[in-house]
């Protein structure tokens, strides 16, 4: 028999923009894009919800992004701040998940298999973790809970806006993945 697994995918969308807004209040509630600033052909890496609403997408040229959204603020990546914040995120999840794996800054897989007696249902553990991140740093996350990484990742990344959670119960993966 297959062992039941509980895999959580936790993502803080536009993590670097979230961090920049924490440090610079003028970036809040306005369209922001993360891109290398000193290159004419720079591509947008992350966008705020406000920029997304104006049609700006990751992978787009900065030039096109500025045409679509004249009020766009383009900020450069800050890898040291991002890495430091990701380490803080890792520290924060340790009490909740004995086994975890980093995907990219602001994104983690947590293996909550076998932790139900200690922490309760995985979706409840994920909800407590989400609350802690919001209270401690103001980070809103998208969370997917499923039996494997692929389904939990899709469950998290296909949510509209954080904070949101989606749990795909064992046996319902096929229905969730169907087009």
Write out the residue ranges for each language-model feature:
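Short intrinsically disordered, low-complexity coil segments enriched in acidic
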Residues: 1-2, 179
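Long, highly charged, low-complexity intrinsically disordered interaction regions
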Residues: 132-179
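Residues that scaffold, gate, or flank divalent-cation-dependent active/transport sites
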Residues: 2-109, 114-116, 122-134, 142-145, ...
């Amino acid at each position: 028999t297959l062992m039941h697994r509980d895999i959580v995918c936790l993502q803080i969308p536009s993590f670097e923009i979230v961090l920049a807004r924490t440090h610079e209040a003028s970036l809040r509630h306005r369209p922001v894009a993360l891109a290398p600033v000193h290159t004419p052909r720079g591509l947008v890496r992350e966008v705020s919800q406000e920029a997304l609403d104006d049609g700006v997408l990751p992978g787009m040229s900065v030039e096109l992004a500025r045409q679509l959204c004249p009020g766009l603020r383009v900020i450069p990546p800050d890898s040291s701040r991002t890495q430091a914040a990701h380490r803080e995120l890792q520290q924060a999840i340790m009490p909740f998940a004995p086994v975890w794996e980093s995907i990219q800054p602001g994104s983690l897989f947590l293996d909550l298999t076998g932790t139900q007696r200690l922490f309760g249902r995985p979706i409840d553990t994920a909800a407590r973790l989400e609350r802690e991140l919001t209270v401690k740093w103001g980070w809103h996350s998208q969370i997917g809970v499923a039996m494997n990484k692929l389904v939990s990742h899709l469950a998290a990344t296909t949510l509209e806006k954080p904070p949101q959670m989606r749990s795909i119960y064992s046996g319902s993966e096929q229905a969730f993945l169907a087009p």
